[in-house]
UniProtKB/Swiss-Prot annotation:
Function description: Catalyzes the condensation of (S)-aspartate-beta-semialdehyde [(S)-ASA] and pyruvate to 4-hydroxy-tetrahydrodipicolinate (HTPA).
Name of the protein described by the UniProt record: 4-hydroxy-tetrahydrodipicolinate synthase
Biological classification of the source: Bacteria, Pseudomonadati, Chlorobiota, Chlorobiia, Chlorobiales
GO MF entry, a single one: 4-hydroxy-tetrahydrodipicolinate synthase activity
Amino-acid positions noted as binding pyruvate in the UniProt annotation, renumbered to this chain: 49, 208
Length: 296
């Protein structure tokens, strides 16, 4: 049995806003309690799903403090703290640690399209700036370039606090290389709900999930079933919720999941530009699936 620190079901938490665009801290606390009661293993605010590009440094710090306060010792609090400017990424990481984050999710620099050595040096500076664990976030669909398995493994071997990767490349050759060649302490997490089952079958450690915002017990149940070797149970869960996993990306994340949560009475349907509400047709599709699953 592995003792890896980063594993299980992690929710990539939405950031609830009020109609005036301010952060709804009361709703944020409700969300944390929802996940505490559901048994979520790790809660992760201020990531992509949390609309981090539109949060100020001060808002991010206050969100992390609020989540940590409400979570207590019931689950680990990781936090998104990355950007494409290394100096700013270091600043955000230090701020997150100071605010109470117990791990940092650091996205690969986007837009700049650095070389593999550039990626290495970026994450080296981040890792050396904090004492908490670092989760490298590799998401080529948003960053327009891939952090190679070789670079990720080099970082994992060179820095004791580089403890995980959120791998959202859907490149199974890369995923298998990471799983097969990693240090024992290093976790490989998927960032794609729709790939949880095959990912775990290959030896992955868990998921950093969008769908866990809506169905945390379901996501944890699937991951736990795969860890226990209960393939048929996991397949049944995946079959039932596969459409929801897909509909969460019918529009740009987190627009669909936030709309779903608004129907579930958890948050207001409020975003910060440039994100806008879904089309009426997509809303109807999502609502119908939530009704089908008995979530509303």
């Amino acid at each position: 049995m592995s003792n890896r620190l980063i594993s299980g079901s992690t929710v990539a938490l939405v950031t609830p806003f009020k109609e005036d665009g301010s952060v709804d801290y009361e709703a944020l606390r409700r969300l944390v309690r929802f996940h505490r009661e559901a048994g979520t293993d790790i809660i992760l605010p201020c990531g992509t799903t949390g609309e981090s590009p539109t949060l100020t440094n001060e808002e991010e710090a206050e969100i992390i403090r609020t989540v940590r306060d409400e979570a207590g010792d019931s689950m680990m609090v990781a936090a998104g703290a990355g950007t494409n400017d290394t100096r700013h990424a270091v600043e955000l990481s230090r701020n997150a640690e100071k605010a109470g984050a117990q791990a940092i999710l650091s996205v690969a620099p986007y837009y700049n399209k650095p070389s593999q050595e550039g990626y290495y040096q970026h994450f080296r500076h981040v890792a050396e700036s904090v004492s908490v664990p670092i989760i490298i976030y590799n998401v080529p669909g948003r960053t327009a370039s891939n952090v190679s398995a070789e670079t990720i493994l080099r970082l994992a071997h060179d820095f004791d606090n580089v403890l995980a990767v959120k791998e959202a490349s859907a490149n199974f050759e890369q995923i298998m290389t990471l799983i097969d060649e990693r240090p024992e302490r290093f976790s490989v997490m998927t960032g794609e709900d729709g790939l949880m089952l095959p990912f775990m079958a290959l030896g992955g450690d868990g998921v950093i999930s969008v769908a866990a915002n809506q169905v945390p017990k379901v996501v944890k149940g699937l991951i736990d079933a795969m860890k226990a070797g209960n393939l048929e149970e996991a397949r049944a869960i995946n079959r039932k919720y596969r459409k929801l996993f897909r509909l969460n990306f019918i529009d740009s994340n987190p627009v669909p999941v936030k709309y779903a949560l608004s129907l579930m009475g958890m948050v207001e349907e409020a975003y910060r530009l440039p994100l806008v509400p879904m089309s009426d047709a997509d809303k109807a599709t999502m609502k119908a699936e939530l009704e089908q699953l008995g979530l509303i």
